[in-house]
Amino acid sequence: MDYQQAGVDIEAGRSFVKTIKDNVESTYRPGVLGGLGGFGGCFEIPAGYRQPVLISGTDGVGTKLKIAHQTDQHHTVGIDLVAMCVNDILTSGAEPLFFLDYLATGKLEPEQLAQVVAGIVEGCKQSGCALLGGETAEMPGFYQAGEYDLAGFCVGIVEKSEILDGSQVQVGDVAIALPSSGVHSNGFSLVRKIIEMNQLSWDDKPAAFQGKTLGEVFLTPTQIYVQAIQGALKAKMEIHGMAHITGGGLPENLPRCLQANQSMAIDPSTWEIPTLFQWLQTMGDVPQAAMWDTFNMGVGYVVIVPAPKAAENVAWFKAQGIAAWQVGTVVAGQGEVLGLQ
């Protein structure tokens, strides 16, 4: 017996790397040293920094992958993977430099995984970061047929004096919201349960979604905010703090960019909750509090700025074609998010 008979096709793995090589290298930016295939990826720290600090992050896509498996649509989850990582490090003010991925599957299916990598490449291009390397692990007997798991890792850079860590946030500051593109990559265990409970298929087209299938709606990739936020930073917008609204929604993520003696008062009347979330709440009979605690509810990213600059900053985002609105105010408190009834 050999390794292939045991379920691991080494030649298929080599062929897969050759197939994706050009696509991966299309993400390269200044700083990348060498090419694909080495034991480690090399990246030169950009010039011009006095005290450069590297910011790292890692994340996955969660059970959203189950929808990709069940619909055989794999071209968007790679974007999700990059988005979940780069949006996180962006909150520190970091510019993403490079990205690494880990892809594990029971049996290597080249066409399927090429779709996944194409999505990762697209996410890296949207973020301006290089796909510096990755690992594709074929693990027979470990995953169900046709299924895979993903993990991503990114590294960015910021000047030490410009790190955003919440210490600059002051009572009276205003929170500016940037919209999400949908559920993003959190809350899918509840989403899938609601679909199952109502005996729906991912091919179904509820009237609420204007001709789109449930699969199309829920596989919409996570919005990447790098261009918007890096643009704001380069335009010298005075930003005191930022939050990426992921698992736990606004209640869990907003306090992460506040000081211990601060809370955030949110005004939900400042935006219309997207139809998608209203549909989920109705179909799943989900309590209002659970909706806020699980989903982003239409707010994907929050930027905290000084009150006198808030209107001007909202106008700046809109001038760049980015929807934005004033969503709340920093108040004295103990790390709570107020106003979400």
Swiss-Prot record:
Gene Ontology BP, a term? 'de novo' IMP biosynthetic process
Pathway(s) of this molecule: Purine metabolism; IMP biosynthesis via de novo pathway; 5-amino-1-(5-phospho-D-ribosyl)imidazole from N(2)-formyl-N(1)-(5-phospho-D-ribosyl)glycinamide: step 2/2
GO cellular component terms?
cytosol
| Protein EC | 6.3.3.1
* Location, primary (coarse class): cytoplasm
Instruction: Provide the GO MF annotations for this entry.
Output: ATP binding; phosphoribosylamine-glycine ligase activity; phosphoribosylformylglycinamidine cyclo-ligase activity
Q: Which reaction does it catalyse?
A: 2-formamido-N(1)-(5-O-phospho-beta-D-ribosyl)acetamidine + ATP = 5-amino-1-(5-phospho-beta-D-ribosyl)imidazole + ADP + phosphate + H(+)
Localization = Cytoplasm
Q: Which InterPro entries match?
A: PurM-like_C_dom, PurM-like_C_sf, PurM-like_N, PurM-like_N_sf, PurM_cligase
Q: Which UniProt keywords apply?
A: ATP-binding, Cytoplasm, Ligase, Nucleotide-binding, Purine biosynthesis
Give one Pfam hit by family name.
AIRS_C
Q: Give the protein family.
A: Belongs to the AIR synthase family.
Mind telling me which NCBIfam families this protein's record contains?
A: purM
Q: What is this protein called?
A: Phosphoribosylformylglycinamidine cyclo-ligase
Give the source species. Answer: Picosynechococcus sp. (strain ATCC 27264 / PCC 7002 / PR-6) (Agmenellum quadruplicatum)
